[in-house]
Amino acid sequence: MTTLASSYDPSSFESRLYAQWEAAGYFVPSDTGEPYTVLLPPPNVTGTLHMGHAFQQTLMDALVRYHRMRGYDTLWQVGTDHAGIATEMVVSRNLALEGKGETRDSLGREGFIAKVWEWKAASGDTIERQMRRLGTSSDWSRSTFTMDPQPSAAVNEAFVRWYEQGLIYRGQRLVNWDPVLKTAISDLEVENVEEDGFLWSIRYPLADGVTYEHIEHDADGNETLRETRDYLVVATTRPETMLGDTAVMVHPEDARYLTLHTARIVLPLTGRHVPVITDDYVDRAFGTGVVKVTPAHDFNDYQVGERHNLPLVNLFTADAKIIDPRKQYPDDESPFVNAGIDWRELDQIQRKRLGQHLAYKIPAQYIGLDRYDARKLVLSELEDLSILVETKPHKLQVPRGDRTGQVIEPYLTDQWFVKMDALAKRGLELVESGQIQFVPPNWINTYRHWMENIQDWCISRQLWWGHRIPAWFDDAGHCHVGHDEAEVRAKHGLGAEIALHQDSDVLETWFSSQLWPFSTLGWPDSQAMAERGFARYLPSSVLVTGFDIIFFWVARMIMATDSFTGQVPFRDVYITGLIRDAQGQKMSKSKGNVLDPLDIIDGISIEDLVAKRTNGLMQPRMAEKIEKATRKEFPDGIIAHGADALRFTIAALATHGRDIKFDLGRAEGYKNFCNKLWNATRFVLMNTEGARFTGVPQPRTEAEKWILARLDKVTAETHAHYANYRFDLLAQSLYEFAWNAFCDWFVELAKPALNNQDTDAAASTRHTLLYVLESLLRLLHPLTPFVTEELWQQVVPRLGITTATISLQRFPQVGDVDTSGYATAEADVEWLKSMVSALRRVRSELNVPPSKQVRLLLQADTADERPRVARFASQLSFLLKLERIDWLDAGQDTPPSAAAIVGELTLLVPLEGLVDMDAERMRLDKEIKRVKGEIGKCNGKLGNATFVQNAPAVVVDQERARLADWTTQLAGLREQRGKL
């Protein structure tokens, strides 16, 4: 007797099975067979699993399990990232919540870092526990943390090598600066948000008595104004930065300003003279065609400043207040700038000193003001001077830090950079030569665009948590780079009497992440490389990641791996879309639409779900709105679906598009799919009690041959879909075979044989049921590992299989069963299915009870179908509850019947005795009258021009859809009435 539970309850076995798998070491690389390696994009160590993680990890796990079952030596390299900024914020927030008065600054660097390690120890394995719950089949003994000793050594080695090769340098450049965190951040950490702002137009007086003829025209080209002006009008969205202007620019071909190419203007509020320059960057059609240039506070202006050798005036402190130049640059009130030197002839040192000197021209009343307070004062003083021409509303793209929400400042600081030109050229060659394949291939265009427009990479961050930059400075400011201080002293002959201090900055996390493909394999330590299989597992087989980090991570891994190892990091890059909610909105805490994958797996009450979505909001005022929306969408919370239902849902949604809408209803449907598989297995087990088989079935019935042929085809489709990373088509193929072919049809078609006195047919059918079910479980296992393992353990003893786990059982192959002679059987069973479907449809339309036997009459122009009907008569009678099957001769009168057509056959079901003819006619006539009335209402509305023209388009479309539905219903009712 089967010991399989009577109902599908994933909570009763999923955690148990995972613990068994891990304890048995099934996920450890085998060291035999062809290597297959997958890299996990390392999530933040203090983070939790979100839908994006679950989506990509499900696909990775399916690939790993599939290849493990095919005999590959699989390594799924997992681990976590130290996530500098995110982790510092989490720990700082927790210090505040503890209420002990401890802060980052009060603890100091060493004390704070100790707190971070404490936090990592307490909560750092949360995400790994969650990954286990999802079914991640990785060797956890190889899990790597980017701050572990081995990866940290790799970071130092990479920095030193690139520095010695001249690829890493320290310089003053413009970076994205978060004035709250007081650190540079990457482009990926900046969100451009459309906001309402203003565009201010300001008069900049021309210097040296210069004037020009200003002419304006209307839309038809007619002159509307001509006057002599001694000023230029400049429009800006950031008037406070005018204090740092070092030029204004016009287009070289703009006829309005041809006479001003050598002019200067007097910068309002400061009295400084700055040049008018010409540059093709200017859009002549925007505003007045005159643009202020502030190289130290705008990325585009910075590029202009580089082209024209303009000085850079840094206005702000690290927390976005106006600097006090006498404190910032105490030695740089330099007299050389008054000696008549042309700014275009300055070298870099002179240019820097000039920028610092010009900061002394900032009016005293601005020093120490916050940037927005400075803006107010600038506007007030411009208005007092009557040179604020216009203020008008303007839509702005405001750069905000994704963690603090603060406006990011383009900020001039000394940072460490990597020269990217040569690295990018090589990285592009590796992809375009085909050594690395992108899937879908259109993402190569995105990769190419980024690589061809690359800029030097700012790798330093003003944080404490992270890999500290291996550079030491002496008191004279000389920089020395090495693996440690001892090496620096030995290499440069620096005695103990020379004081050295290490750079306080750390490397941004992408620097260590770019080394992930080979630092996890022991590089650069030769012994560790041998132990961890560097030569065997690099390059990895595939990287599964999102399109949003193609440049920030994928490209950098390609460049770094080639630079340090001479190899590519991976063969394939499978780019997934981004998970959004069912309405296509980005999932975010602030919108209150985040779905926790573990809540889908294990379920959550509505109260707990509301608490999870409303606690810790950056905008607490949104809590009420989020709670209301959550209670409306999930009035009873979220039911438990189990990991397999979530995984299958993810696979089914994994199209090759940019955005993927996650619909929880799909998960409910795939939970039903798992339940269907469970019940089908119970049927098979109950009907094969005591049976023992080995080898491949020798089918005796057409139904067996049909299902074996279908199994061979779905096996071929499965391999093809894995090869092409089409998880959506994979899920569709397996679903169709499991639900329709096996559960709905073969289980039904097997019943006549199982209940037949032909013992050979019954035995072969039992064998085929077990064989196909076992093969199906293996086909499904990479996507739904838990339910397939639980069912497989019940099935395989009856097939003589002794392998301990389905995860190590050989994956089905095309040709496991020779189906070359099964074409006729396939055609016959497809015909049988059509017959059964047609007759069941008739019974349903006539509301004939399932247990009621009916008579079937058949008509055909030829006798060709008679032998096939005779062969399948017993199956038809069993499946359709047929009293008898009779043939009508040509011209023979037919009784009142319901009819259906299958090929050349007409199927007739006599109505006498099945329905009350008079009552059924009355019912249908009444229903037809009602539907006609509804159609009349729709036609009345749609025939009313006022309604069609004035009603919202969506309302009109709904009315048209209703008309189509009613019309379809009427046709069906009339057809039924005609049969009576």
UniProtKB/Swiss-Prot annotation:
A motif ('HIGH' region) lies at residues 43-53. Residues 914-980 form a coiled coil. Belongs to the class-I aminoacyl-tRNA synthetase family. ValS type 1 subfamily. One of its GO terms (molecular function) is valine-tRNA ligase activity. Its main location: cytoplasm. GO terms for biological process: valyl-tRNA aminoacylation. Keywords: Aminoacyl-tRNA synthetase, ATP-binding, Coiled coil, Cytoplasm, Ligase, Nucleotide-binding, Protein biosynthesis. It comes from Xanthomonas oryzae pv. oryzae (strain KACC10331 / KXO85). ATP binds at residue 589. CDD domains: Anticodon_Ia_Val (cd07962). This is Valine--tRNA ligase. It is found in: Cytoplasm. Catalyzes the attachment of valine to tRNA(Val). As ValRS can inadvertently accommodate and process structurally similar amino acids such as threonine, to avoid such errors, it has a 'posttransfer' editing activity that hydrolyzes mischarged Thr-tRNA(Val) in a tRNA-dependent manner. The keyword Metal-binding does not apply. The lineage of its organism: Bacteria, Pseudomonadati, Pseudomonadota, Gammaproteobacteria, Lysobacterales. GO terms for cellular component: cytosol. ValRS has two distinct active sites: one for aminoacylation and one for editing. The misactivated threonine is translocated from the active site to the editing site. The C-terminal coiled-coil domain is crucial for aminoacylation activity. InterPro entries: aa-tRNA-synth_I_CS, aa-tRNA-synth_Ia, Anticodon_Ia_Val, M/V/L/I-tRNA-synth_anticd-bd, Rossmann-like_a/b/a_fold, tRNA-bd_arm, tRNAsynth_Ia_anticodon-bd, Val-tRNA_synth_C_sf.
